[in-house]
Regions:
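Bacterial Sec-dependent N-terminal signal peptides
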Residues: 1-42
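Sequence/structural signature of beta-propeller domains
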Residues: 41-377
Length: 377
């Protein structure tokens, strides 16, 4: 029957080399195009725009959270009172570009605790998250290592997240405590971590310990404000030499994706003695708690199996500079989801902290807002 149609059983001795050659060609092509495939999975960076474009004065912006309908709550770490600003941020529905930014108002605690030495809030507000179930916001303070709830008029409600003792003020490297806060409405989880390694977990990356890798604990909380899960997170290795007069390296923010995955921003800023060779590099990684190994406060991170740290996927990296020819230095501390575009793509907003326009002479920092368009994970 086969021969009747002019066909016969293939000779495997003759076809095998052909199949091998075909496999080799496919392998070569896959290796050739792998970098292109990888880059296609990176976020699209639309760059940064100075808030001064919309006549917004310099600030100390350290966290941002979406309130819905193009409104955002923004915290500052150097205000007289703890609380938050409200911004209107409009993005182009097709491109994601920022079209306008308007600073509405500041909502502050009417009875703040103020430092006698500095005249500003002792809370050192660093991270903020909107909590839809109660219509409130939670603010993480690095000065007290607490995460307190505020109503939309900026007044404390008296409630707070039950932070595990391991994150207490006495257990952090000074000024390297809670820097981040996020909430996922889908999974009903709050998320935070310290900026750098806890004292019990090892050395913090920096001039005293060059080339160190920070080992962090990502902590989540339920809607009832109780802690629910903890995960081990290993940062990329920090700078090993040639430090400037100020060096800061740690996780400056966390954002949540609708499906519960997290975006973690690793920020490395190096300020030179003369300022004009300073730079700040930010890397944004995606991690998935649902595919990660849970730990608890008793876990020894230095002895933990490397495979039990969260698996990171880099989605964006960028560096800003302060040089005689390029003065776009930006210390990004806030990050949250922006608007969803008409084609379904999701944007990410980042806001920088200029330290109130810090600088001297003609050189001063600016506050920037930056837009990334996330890849289709």
């Amino acid at each position: 029957m086969v021969k009747a149609f002019g066909l016969s059983k293939p000779n495997l001795l003759h076809t095998q080399p052909h199949n091998n050659m075909k496999s080799k060609i496919l392998l070569a092509l896959s290796l050739l195009f792998m970098p292109l495939i990888s880059s296609a999975q990176q976020a699209v960076d639309l760059g940064q725009v100075a808030l001064s474009k919309w006549r917004i004065g310099t600030g100390n912006y350290s966290g941002i959270a979406s309130l819905g309908n193009n409104r955002y709550a923004v915290v500052s770490d150097k205000e007289i009172t703890d609380g938050f600003f409200t911004f209107l941020i409009d993005q182009n529905a097709t491109t994601g570009a920022i079209e306008s930014v308007y600073l509405e108002s500041f909502k502050g605690n009417s009875s703040p605790k103020v430092s006698a030495a500095t005249g500003i809030s002792v809370r050192d507000c660093e991270g903020i998250a909107y909590f839809p179930p109660a219509g409130t916001v939670f603010i993480a303070g690095e000065g007290d290592q607490k995460i307190l709830e505020y109503n939309m008029n900026g007044q404390p409600t008296g409630r707070e997240l039950t932070v595990p003792k391991i994150f207490g003020l006495g257990n952090i490297v000074p000024n390297y405590g809670f820097e981040s806060l996020a909430y996922c409405p889908t999974t009903h989880r709050f998320w935070t971590t310290t900026e750098s390694t806890l004292l019990k977990d090892g050395n913090a990356a920096g001039p005293m310990h060059p080339g160190e890798q920070n080992l962090l604990r990502l902590q989540s909380f339920r809607d009832d404000l109780l802690p629910i899960a903890q995960y081990a997170y290993r940062m990329d290795r920090g700078k090993a030499d040639d430090f400037g007069k100020i060096y800061v390296y740690g996780v400056s923010e966390i954002a949540t994706l609708p499906d519960g995955r997290l975006l973690v921003m690793e920020r490395e800023a190096d300020i030179s003695n003369g300022y004009l060779s300073s730079q700040c590099t930010c890397k944004i990684f995606m991690v998935n708690p649902q595919e990660s190994w849970m730990i608890d406060s008793s876990t020894d991170l230095q002895k933990l199996d490397p495979n039990k740290f969260m698996t990171k996927r880099l989605i964006a990296t960028f560096t800003t500079h302060m040089t005689p020819f390029k003065q776009n230095f930006a210390n990004y501390e806030g990050m949250c989801l922006g608007r969803q575009l008409n084609d379904g793509r999701q944007t990410l907003l980042l806001i920088s902290d200029s330290q109130g326009g810090y600088g001297k002479g003609p050189v001063h920092l600016k506050d920037y807002i930056r837009v990334l368009i996330l890849p289709d994970f």
